[in-house]
Amino acid sequence: MTAAITATDDINNQKAVEKTAQEAPVLFNTEPTDCGHLIGIMTLNTPKSLNALSVEMCQLLSQQLEQWQSDNQIVALVLQGAGDKAFCAGGDIRKLYDSMSSDAPLPNPYATEFFGHEYRLYRQMHFYPKPLILWGDGIIMGGGMGLMAGCSHRLVTERTRFAMPEVTIGLFPDASGSWFLQRMPAKTGLFLGLTGAMCNGNDAILANLAEYAVTSSDYGAIIQSLKQSDWQVSASSMDKCDDNSAHSIVSRALAAQPVAELPASKLATYWQPIQQLMNSGGLGDIDVLLQNDAALEKLNVEFANDSWTQRAVDTYRHGCPVTAALTYALYHKVTDLSLEQVLYLEANVAVHCAANPDFKEGVRALLIDKDRSPQWSRSLADCLSSEGQAYIQQHFVNPYAKGEHPLGDWLGDEALGSQLVR
């Protein structure tokens, strides 16, 4: 009887361990290739929150990336989200909200921890030597966009929906948004940052955020193609995969997949009126057009009357004016900055936002009380005044004492921007 009980206990304990492992916020496993190497699979595993990034998830991803970087058996990595709704719908901002009390210090310790880990992860991904393959199926927003931007090979599907909707919560397009929005063609990135417009997979390809259009049912075939690739071509006698060759192998395998027919790109259709709108003058001039239906129709009737545009414009009109001012300022401020300088600057802005009223008010209205009626602290006219501009510029100032900035070591002997970044 004792032996039977012991055996039963062992089985139950094993099941408990397996259940706990499957409940981890990020899952890691490997797939063997036909020629004896391994493909690492990283799965964001919080589908109930649409795989929103937490501090723990950033830490787990960073640790595993470091471990697999030095593992010669690992030739490429795949990053995906659990469930069929989202890859990653942003950051877990509820804990940030809880930390934003009226007597919280500047800089806020939790905001420092959250944004510090998040931005270090993005930097690590951008400079990662091995192929990072993004399975960009479903919703991708905020922090998920930062992960997307950091991957070397990005796949999108007919279900891909991406946005930088921070204007609705009083933050700003963070998560390296200032970096990748600036690099979109025809000032479409500025439009997306100001309006939080929702885009699709074809838009992602046009905006330099993705390279491959596939269907959501192609995942298994893609993994199989990667497993069957000839990784020995890039392996040395020490069984170490050459990273450049590995990138080429992944590119060939993905390019060989059937190209899916995705929904038409709104950015491709309307890039000209978007560019005209964003080039109409300063933020005040852009605002005049965005606030006036007749002015938008005069700019381009089809653009103005498209439900996609109308949703974007409505989001802007109800969004946070301070966010709009920060978005516009950052878009022009980062033009000549390196990725690391942009992340460093964004970390400053993020911590200031956590100390100022609009971010907390936006989260309250959207996620806590859910009344969707935020009371913003300033109008856009206030933001454009001399006092308002000083307030906006204060967000860029380093709020940390000397040596305490979470990304401060990036300003050491190695000059920012000196590394090759994708």
Predicted features and spans:
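Glycine-rich beta-to-alpha active-site loop
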Residues: 125-169, 191-192, 196-197, 201, ...
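Amphipathic alpha-helical blocks and their helix-capping loop/short-beta junctions
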Residues: 215-315
